[in-house]
Design a protein with these regions (language model features):
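Secretory N-termini
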Residues: 1-85, 130
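Primarily a LysM-type cell-wall glycan-binding module
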Residues: 47-52, 57, 83-111, 115
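Residues that form or flank phosphate/diphosphate-binding pockets in enzymes
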Residues: 61, 112, 126
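Residue-level recognition of oxygen-bearing side chains
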Residues: 62, 99, 136
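Surface-exposed beta-strand edges and their flanking turn/coil or helix-capping segments
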Residues: 66-68, 94, 106-109, 132, ...
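Extracellular LysM carbohydrate-binding repeats and other cell-envelope/extracellular binding modules
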Residues: 69, 73-87, 115-141
Length: 141
């Protein structure tokens, strides 16, 4: 799939700037567990400001959730998807003033489909109104 870019200076803080990649990788893997995302078969490794994924996820949807969960972490500028199979996902970077309704209108042609975007981004999203500029969201297709 390639490299998916994220805003490095926004997101959940899981590790410090001085933590080495091994410590950060452990924190990222724990975050997936805490979110209830089954990353069995997917190897997660932090390399500099990027996360590299390899192996195979159970589904395309799960792989995309793993990518957005890890990429929306403070200090991560990209997720390199080297996993087996799958297709190119559709993503949207939240801009100032965006709402899920507006994103659904733009990406899916119908603002009322905002709930589909919300569901596609659970458990990272806990409420449809809790999005922030720089956050990357999955758009279900």
């Amino acid at each position: 799939m390639g490299l998916l870019r994220f805003a490095k200076n926004v997101g959940k803080s899981l590790f410090g700037d001085d933590d080495d990649d091994a410590v950060a990788t452990e924190a990222l893997t724990k975050e997936l567990d805490d979110l209830g995302l089954d990353a069995a078969g997917v190897e997660v490794k932090k390399e500099g400001e990027e996360v590299v994924l390899s192996g195979a996820a159970a589904s395309q949807s799960l792989k995309e959730k793993i990518m957005t969960a890890l990429g929306n972490v403070k200090g991560i500028s990209g997720v390199q998807d080297n996993t087996e199979g799958g297709t190119e996902g559709v993503f949207h970077t939240v801009e100032k003033g965006d709402t899920l309704w507006a994103i659904a209108e733009k990406a899916m042609g119908n603002g009322a489909k905002y709930e589909e975007i919300f569901e596609a981004n659970k458990p990272m999203l806990t409420h449809p109104d809790k999005i922030y500029p720089g956050q990357v969201l999955r758009i279900p297709v």
